[in-house]
């Protein structure tokens, strides 16, 4: 993940920025007690699956955007297959890299709204792609400018048990 060759070729500046963020995250946490320190001291490097726990949602969104399309589609396919398996749904869920980018964008927007005490209702998410997910879930009465868009993506991406808990707490 620190090798520029593993990312898109059309935006070298953006890719270098992402690699810089990853490197800085490792640097900032290498002295602290935790997984990064352990992996650096005991293994000489930090696996990506450890590093992502130290990244912000925005960092993850931009990192995903810097990946090659083939890698993005592998990730999207993984989540589609996981959803179909957990919900025992034989209908094929076709989500692609654009859907995943939209999910990460809306999660970042919602997180920032919450962190800065902004309202979530009637928020404008007009540039978020959701029709593919809504059609699959057979939801016809939705508006791209509502928080329900984030909830639709959570249903697809979260483990079923986590989503059920989230949904029940939301309704409480």
Protein language model annotation of sequence segments:
Residues 1-172:
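Long, contiguous internal "core" modules enriched in hydrophobic/ aromatic residues
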């Amino acid at each position: 993940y620190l090798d520029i060759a593993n990312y898109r070729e059309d935006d070298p500046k953006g890719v270098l920025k992402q690699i810089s963020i990853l490197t800085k995250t490792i640097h900032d946490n290498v002295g602290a007690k935790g997984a990064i320190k352990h992996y650096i001291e005991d293994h000489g490097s930090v696996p990506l699956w450890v590093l992502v726990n130290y990244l912000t949602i925005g960092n993850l969104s931009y990192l995903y955007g810097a990946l090659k399309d083939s890698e993005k589609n592998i990730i999207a396919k993984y989540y589609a297959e996981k959803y179909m398996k957990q919900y025992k749904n034989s209908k094929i869920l076709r989500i692609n890299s654009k859907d995943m980018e939209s999910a990460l964008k809306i999660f970042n927007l919602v997180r920032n709204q919450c962190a800065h005490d902004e309202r979530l209702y009637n928020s404008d998410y007009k540039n978020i792609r959701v029709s593919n997910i809504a059609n699959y879930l057979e939801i016809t009465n939705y508006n791209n400018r509502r928080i329900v868009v984030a909830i639709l993506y959570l249903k697809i991406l979260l483990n079923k048990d986590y989503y059920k808990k989230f949904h029940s707490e939301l309704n409480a």
